[in-house]
Amino acid sequence: MNISMLERKINRENSYKLKPVSELKKGDKIPLVSDTMFHVMINNSSKKKYSAYLISLVLGLEYKEVYSSLIFVNNKLDREKYKDSSKTVDFVCRLNGKIIGIEMNNNSTKEALERNISYAADLYKSKMVSGEKYNYETVLQININNFTFEGNNKIMEEYSLRNEEGEEFTKKLKYIHIYLPNIKKKCYNKEKLNVLERLLLTFNEEENLSDITKGDRIME
């Protein structure tokens, strides 16, 4: 019997370790897996080039097109609409009629991953207005995971609603998972990295950055 990815054991080998603030020394690099650094580098309109570059690489789009079209939006989900406490997602933007959410996942509990599903569903219904015609927008939820699942060596994979034959039910709700430990492992094994993998390493690694960023005007 097939076991769903969410039901598998979590593998934290090669994950990035976060130092407590009290242990940080002058000159220490804070990796992107830190909530603080994620908001500084990605959820920050003054550093739009980084979020635009990341999204363009994940979705296979032209960087200039993404940069010119990307619009930052409020990342707090309205508690009155959902009869729940206010929930904040790490990053939300609009891009050519789509809503894109990005979550940086350090918490590898099943409950945390279930929340990721809930966030995307909430974004999907976020434009419903009582008494008016329903307007469901396309939502892409990108999860950058500081862990992987047992037996999963993939760098990135996409999930959507499909039947047992693999036919897609809708294109309006998709989940993209990226596994940082598998990128790190690929780098340590001296395998050639693509641009997305190099970017994510640049955000998190402390050493050999010049080799990773060489030739990329945005990363440099």
Give the label of every model feature segment.
Residues 1-220:
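Elongated, amphipathic alpha-helical interaction scaffolds
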